[in-house]
């Protein structure tokens, strides 16, 4: 579907409403920075607090701005299989290139339940599906063996966003899924694990950091894929302070503060999320300056 960097893009708000003017600026910044895909309405896009009408407007606006240059992937995960399918169908109708489906959260399905969830949805859409494994938020972990079973059996499930963070699991997930199906893709769901996942044979990252540093994150992957491993490692090391700073509070609180400092969006979130503390804002100012982004 894509190799390299897919930006998990924020959803800008202003006075409680979608700020589509700011959103267009941010999308064009991503395109200029060379990212390979946009992921709309994921965790970073505050999907749980965006209503169905807003979802439609945001996805439509994204497709309009991108105009086929890169894939547009829409977050469509819930903890109800039927509700998830409804969001998938909305994305399909709007013309999205694919959907990112987080594992059902709170109700904690078994590995068999996870498999059946993705099987049910994949049989009812022609869209490309990406599994999103983020056990720190969902309470459920897609084991490498389950990911490999999905890869083997469900042909329109094209890859997994692996945000487990465990290096051993990353390695096993890459190894088992690609043994099951050579074109199955694995993206890091943690910016600070991107280089390690690439070394394990993965395909890139679905990134928060690329909201503020699209070119740098794109360069990291491009250098690696070109065989310039040491150059990629150097970029990774330079990005480490930014990677760390953007997660000192719950995502997307710091990244919205950073984008506000850079002049792209208002520093506005929807409850239950609140803006970054003054301490975090000061930290971000320093890191952004050191990174040449402010």
From Swiss-Prot:
<dbReference type="GO" id="GO:0009089">
    <property type="term" value="P:lysine biosynthetic process via diaminopimelate"/>
</dbReference>
<keyword id="KW-0220">Diaminopimelate biosynthesis</keyword>
<comment type="pathway">
    <text>Amino-acid biosynthesis; L-lysine biosynthesis via DAP pathway; (S)-tetrahydrodipicolinate from L-aspartate: step 3/4.</text>
</comment>
<protein>
    <recommendedName>
        <fullName>4-hydroxy-tetrahydrodipicolinate synthase</fullName>
        <ecNumber>4.3.3.7</ecNumber>
    </recommendedName>
</protein>
<keyword id="KW-0963">Cytoplasm</keyword>
<feature type="binding site">
    <location>
        <position position="44"/>
    </location>
    <ligand>
        <name>pyruvate</name>
    </ligand>
</feature>
<keyword id="KW-0456">Lyase</keyword>
<dbReference type="InterPro" id="IPR020625">
    <property type="entry name" value="Schiff_base-form_aldolases_AS"/>
</dbReference>
<dbReference type="InterPro" id="IPR020624">
    <property type="entry name" value="Schiff_base-form_aldolases_CS"/>
</dbReference>
<keyword id="KW-0457">Lysine biosynthesis</keyword>
<comment type="subunit">
    <text>Homotetramer; dimer of dimers.</text>
</comment>
<dbReference type="GO" id="GO:0005829">
    <property type="term" value="C:cytosol"/>
</dbReference>
<dbReference type="Pfam" id="PF00701">
    <property type="entry name" value="DHDPS"/>
</dbReference>
<feature type="binding site">
    <location>
        <position position="206"/>
    </location>
    <ligand>
        <name>pyruvate</name>
    </ligand>
</feature>
<comment type="function">
    <text>Catalyzes the condensation of (S)-aspartate-beta-semialdehyde [(S)-ASA] and pyruvate to 4-hydroxy-tetrahydrodipicolinate (HTPA).</text>
</comment>
<feature type="site" description="Part of a proton relay during catalysis">
    <location>
        <position position="43"/>
    </location>
</feature>
<keyword id="KW-0028">Amino-acid biosynthesis</keyword>
<feature type="active site" description="Schiff-base intermediate with substrate">
    <location>
        <position position="161"/>
    </location>
</feature>
<dbReference type="InterPro" id="IPR002220">
    <property type="entry name" value="DapA-like"/>
</dbReference>
<feature type="site" description="Part of a proton relay during catalysis">
    <location>
        <position position="106"/>
    </location>
</feature>
<dbReference type="InterPro" id="IPR013785">
    <property type="entry name" value="Aldolase_TIM"/>
</dbReference>
<comment type="similarity">
    <text>Belongs to the DapA family.</text>
</comment>
<keyword id="KW-0704">Schiff base</keyword>
<feature type="active site" description="Proton donor/acceptor">
    <location>
        <position position="132"/>
    </location>
</feature>
<dbReference type="InterPro" id="IPR005263">
    <property type="entry name" value="DapA"/>
</dbReference>
<dbReference type="GO" id="GO:0008840">
    <property type="term" value="F:4-hydroxy-tetrahydrodipicolinate synthase activity"/>
</dbReference>
<dbReference type="GO" id="GO:0019877">
    <property type="term" value="P:diaminopimelate biosynthetic process"/>
</dbReference>
């Amino acid at each position: 579907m894509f190799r390299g960097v897919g930006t998990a893009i924020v959803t800008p708000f202003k006075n409680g409403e979608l700020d589509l003017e700011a959103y267009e600026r941010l999308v064009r910044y991503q395109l200029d920075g060379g990212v390979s895909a946009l992921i709309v309405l994921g965790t970073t896009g505050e999907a749980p607090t965006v209503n169905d009408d807003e979802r439609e407007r945001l996805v439509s606006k994204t497709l309009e701005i991108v105009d086929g240059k890169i894939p547009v992937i829409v977050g469509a995960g819930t903890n109800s299989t039927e509700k998830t399918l409804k969001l998938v169908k909305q994305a399909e109708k709007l013309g999205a290139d694919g959907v990112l489906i987080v594992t059902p959260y709170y109700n904690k399905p078994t590995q068999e339940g996870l498999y059946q969830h993705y099987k049910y949805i994949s049989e009812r859409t022609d869209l490309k599906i990406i599994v999103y494994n983020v056990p720190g938020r969902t309470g459920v972990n897609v084991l490498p063996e389950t990911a490999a079973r999905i890869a083997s059996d469900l042909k329109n499930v094209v890859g997994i966003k692996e945000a487990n963070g465990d290096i051993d699991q990353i390695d096993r997930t890459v190894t088992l899924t690609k043994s099951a199906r050579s074109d199955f893709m694995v993206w890091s769901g943690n910016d600070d694990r991107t280089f390690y996942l690439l070394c394990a044979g993965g395909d890139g990252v679905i990134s928060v950091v690329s909201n503020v540093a699209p070119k740098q994150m794109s360069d990291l992957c491009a250098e690696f894929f070109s065989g310039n491993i040491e150059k990629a490692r150097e970029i990774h090391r330079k990005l480490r302070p930014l990677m760390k700073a953007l997660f000192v509070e719950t995502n997307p609180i710091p990244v919205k503060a950073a984008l506000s400092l850079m002049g792209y969006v208002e520093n506005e979130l929807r409850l239950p999320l609140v803006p970054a503390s003054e301490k975090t804002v000061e930290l971000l100012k320093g890191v952004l300056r050191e990174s040449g982004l402010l």
